[in-house]
């Protein structure tokens, strides 16, 4: 796996699924391929994206700044600086300085990542802030190691949170989660369907699912009533894909 592929993988792992994730993936690919060289426009686009947390925007801004060639005098962006200040905690800043000194001795991506993984997310963000604000310099490879270590920590905590929700025994949470997943699957079906004539059937199935979820939420239903809802939708989606000649892995 190439270095940039690895960086893209880690960065995308912390972004919530949806159309915005696909858009960000495309931007990252363009940046890494050298196709997007307007850093200012890229940062302005990033700043106005909804949904993303300030830290995620900060990490993306840091990655864009590392990768896109820019004039020396180009101003640093406030939204990135604020996200990478370790919540203003002086302890984070102290640890960030210690980490920075260790990173200065590293020359490889993996070496930097290993060193960084033993620090807290706050310290890692602060260390990125030091480098972003030009208070310290490390090689691009080492900076990417720091980015990936931060993303790994964030993804780990997100995974724990998702796992807790997936394994919860609370029937109300499970019920709501099934309905949310059915809705997002329906949305994906509609987006994939496009405007072809064969798409009418998929659109109809997706629309029925949406209406069903809406009705269930409006009148309140037994927590078991949503069981199988998303599975049925996915089966319909797969059947539709086969007819359209599209092969996509079952996204369960």
UniProtKB/Swiss-Prot annotation:
GO MF entry, a single one: RNA binding
GO cellular component terms listed in the entry, alphabetical order: host cell nucleus; membrane; virion membrane
Region entry RNP-binding, spans: 165-252
Membrane topology, as annotated: Peripheral membrane protein
Region (Membrane-binding): 1-164
Motif, Nuclear localization signal: chain positions: 101-105
Membrane spanning stretches: none
Assembly with partners or alone: Homodimer and homomultimer. Interacts with NEP. Binds ribonucleocapsid by both interacting with genomic RNA and NP protein. May interact with HA and NA. Cannot bind NP without genomic RNA.
Name of the protein in its database record: Matrix protein 1
């Amino acid at each position: 796996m190439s270095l940039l592929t690895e960086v893209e993988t880690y960065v995308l792992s912390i972004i919530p699924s949806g159309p915005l994730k696909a858009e960000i993936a495309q931007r990252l690919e363009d940046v890494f391929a050298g196709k997007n060289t307007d850093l200012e426009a890229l940062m302005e686009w990033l700043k106005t994206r909804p949904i993303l947390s300030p830290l995620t925007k900060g990490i993306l801004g840091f990655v864009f700044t590392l990768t896109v060639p820019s004039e020396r005098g180009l101003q640093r962006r406030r939204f990135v600086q604020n996200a990478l200040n370790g919540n203003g905690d002086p302890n984070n800043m102290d640890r960030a300085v210690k980490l920075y000194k260790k990173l200065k001795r590293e020359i490889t991506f993996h070496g930097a990542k290993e060193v960084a993984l033993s620090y807290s997310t706050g310290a890692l963000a602060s260390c990125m802030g030091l480098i972003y604000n030009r208070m310290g310099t490390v090689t691009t490879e080492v900076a990417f190691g720091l980015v990936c270590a931060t993303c790994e920590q964030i993804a780990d905590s997100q995974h724990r949170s998702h796992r807790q929700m997936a394994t919860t025994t609370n029937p109300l949470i499970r019920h709501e989660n099934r309905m949310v997943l059915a809705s997002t699957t329906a949305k994906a079906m509609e987006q994939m369907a496009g405007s072809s004539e064969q798409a009418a059937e998929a659109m109809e199935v997706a629309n029925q699912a949406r209406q069903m979820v809406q009705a269930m939420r409006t009148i309140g239903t037994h927590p078991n009533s949503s069981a199988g809802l998303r599975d049925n939708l996915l089966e319909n989606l797969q059947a539709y894909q086969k007819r359209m000649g599209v092969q996509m892995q079952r996204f369960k």
